[in-house]
């Protein structure tokens, strides 16, 4: 992508309305634009990051055996009245009527709709277990939206829903998502700590929030510091192994970890003083097991091996991609801008032409740009005629992991400079070596 032809509206000044680092940097880098209170457009640079976040989420959901579908954002109020939750959500739920005066709502979540899909199609235990998920925009009329897309009214959510014949089967499905979430956050460059949580209006009796530590977090968290060093389930993880996944769950829930809502001061004080960690954190995922709450209310049942009908046991599992993007920035930035983990960076490399219009610089940059693009790399080529300082500031601000810098003096010697955005390390090398570094 040539920067001269790209839409990336950079802001030179810090926006006054931005309270936290991620909101400020997302606005300055031209990733998002506020349309109204708590509602944002995702501009091209931001959407590239969001798409890569979603790709990782989708990959790990599929690995864990979940199946993707797509449900509508507008839902019938009748389903929510049937489950008994229509009034529980209060003013957070946006309620409307269609031209036939039928009550509708803009879905804040999808337990009712997916249960309706299940009950109309699945009749036998032989079709279980089943886990359905989708990635969709949702709306909750937050009383105080703030922090950009960290806490917005319209947001994107990956929500998955599991169906099992028994509680034991449902716990295995829960453990699958538990392990999948640990892997997902790790691939996004985050260390997430699972903490027992309140089930809230979703309901049920088992729930975990996944929290990343950040000074700007809304939650106060208390946990054992060993969580920071725990190994993440690797690619060899067998998602069909009941014992293997139970061992992962037991390990990650064996030590004390809780947000302020579930905090037990006496239990925390039982942790050796040197092992206690008190901090602030950001919720990046939430999983629930709620048994037969919805299946009983909505008649979702299957015929069991005994020939009798059984209400299915359900769980739901949410990750907010539009919340994850600012969370990653909160965890990875410096005074100059964003430092993206390679897995979600909008571009892999930015090629900086220090003197656009100089034939040697132009030819060198075109050569590098073509070679890296052909090798399948996402490359941003800064071919603008901006000053060198502006080019460097832009590259640092948007956080692309590597910069290849081509100036007249270096190019005359057949060389370019490669900068690592994370470490700041710079290395001069031949043009061929620079290309081979990223395509070998």
UniProtKB/Swiss-Prot annotation:
EC number(s) reported in the record: 6.1.1.15
Gene Ontology cellular component terms for the protein in this record: cytosol
CDD domains found in the cross-reference section: ProRS_anticodon_short, ProRS_core_prok
Keyword terms of this UniProt record: Aminoacyl-tRNA synthetase, ATP-binding, Cytoplasm, Ligase, Nucleotide-binding, Protein biosynthesis
One function term, GO molecular function aspect: proline-tRNA ligase activity
UniProt function note: Catalyzes the attachment of proline to tRNA(Pro) in a two-step reaction: proline is first activated by ATP to form Pro-AMP and then transferred to the acceptor end of tRNA(Pro).
Subunit-structure text: Homodimer.
Sequence similarity: Belongs to the class-II aminoacyl-tRNA synthetase family. ProS type 2 subfamily.
Name of the protein in question: Proline--tRNA ligase
Organism: Rhizobium leguminosarum bv. trifolii (strain WSM2304)
Name of the gene: proS
